[in-house]
UniProtKB/Swiss-Prot annotation:
Keyword list, A-Z: Acetylation, Endoplasmic reticulum, Golgi apparatus, Membrane, Transmembrane, Transmembrane helix
PTM annotation (N-acetylserine): residues: 2
Claim: Transmembrane is one of the keywords in the record: yes
Membrane-spanning segments: 90-110, 135-155, 176-196, 217-237, 243-263
Protein's name according to its UniProt entry: Protein GMH1
Lineage of origin: Eukaryota, Fungi, Dikarya, Ascomycota, Saccharomycotina
Segments for region (Disordered): 1-33
Membrane topology: Multi-pass membrane protein
Organism of derivation: Saccharomyces cerevisiae (strain ATCC 204508 / S288c) (Baker's yeast)
Positions on the Lumenal side per record topology: 111-134, 197-216, 264-273
Length: 273
């Protein structure tokens, strides 16, 4: 009876051959990540609906909001089974786009009628919807996400941020974009939905409305960087990541100063598109 070989015939057996095989696997992985990581983000969207794991996406969204560490621990097990850090299922991404689109509808109705004191016509609502959709999805989510993912991809693949034993490890661009998607969830929740519910208070133009509006914006943006830190801190080959939390320190200072009369909800104004 013949058996399949457990190692290549052109490599010696033993520790030396194993090291050469490992080096070859690492080189193949690096080439694959460099050539396919960005296109993979696009290819994920063309899976059939029956292959979408909506239950897992819902679980991830819930725990990213309430238990972010637990959500990121699941990524480690994905790495063990699928040999990649980035998601291979677009369900989370599709969920997020759907929620942003829903918020665009809500804010387009508000902006076309209640906010601008204009007639609530169907054409006005549709116009505001497409304008809001383009600004929220293209500008706020995609362009901002592309910039953040690219910055961290270029930065964290430098040797300064890797342990000496893991210099050949690569931070995938697709994973960097996944981290952005995870972190953007809190902005989506706080500024796209909760802010809408709190508009009657935020629009009162007093110190209480100033406090609530500024707290909401600073919490959402600050939490974006905290979740970003959790995401990259999950990678076992990275180090010196505390710099990711520096924007939260700056936001804390801005928040305290803003309480003396600077309305951040009006200055940043996510929805006056």
């Amino acid at each position: 009876m013949s058996y399949l070989p457990t190692y290549s015939n052109d490599l010696p057996a033993g520790p030396q051959g194993q090291r050469r095989r490992n080096n070859g696997n690492e080189n193949d992985a690096r080439q694959g990540y460099g050539q396919q990581s960005v296109p993979m983000v696009i290819r994920r969207l063309f899976k059939t609906p029956k292959n979408l794991d909506l239950e897992t996406a819902s679980w991830e969204m819930f725990h990213l909001i309430f238990h972010p560490r637990k959500a990121y621990r699941s990524i480690y097990y994905q790495r063990q089974t699928k040999n990649q850090w980035a998601r291979d299922d677009p369900s989370f991404f599709i969920f997020q786009i759907a929620l942003i689109s829903l918020s665009s509808i809500i804010w387009s109705i508000y902006n076309s009628g209640f906010n601008n004191d204009s007639d609530m016509g169907a054409l006005s609502i549709i116009g505001h919807f497409f304008k809001s959709l383009v600004m929220m999805v293209i500008l706020d989510f995609f362009i901002f996400g592309f910039i953040m993912a690219t910055i961290f991809y270029l930065l964290l693949n430098r040797s300064h941020f890797k342990f000496k034993s893991s210099q050949n490890s690569v931070v995938e661009w697709a994973y960097c974009f996944d981290v952005h998607c995870n972190s953007f969830l809190i902005i989506l929740l706080c500024l796209y939905f909760i802010q809408f519910l709190l508009l009657p208070i935020i629009n009162l133009q007093n110190w209480i409305s100033l406090l609530i509006g500024n707290s909401l914006y600073c919490f959402a943006i600050g939490h974006y960087f905290i979740l970003t830190f959790y995401g990259y801190n999950q990678l076992p080959f990275l180090k010196n990541l505390n710099f990711i939390l520096l924007p939260t320190l700056g936001l804390s200072i801005i928040y305290l100063i803003s309480l003396f009369g600077i309305d951040l909800s009006k200055k940043l104004s996510f929805y006056n598109y």
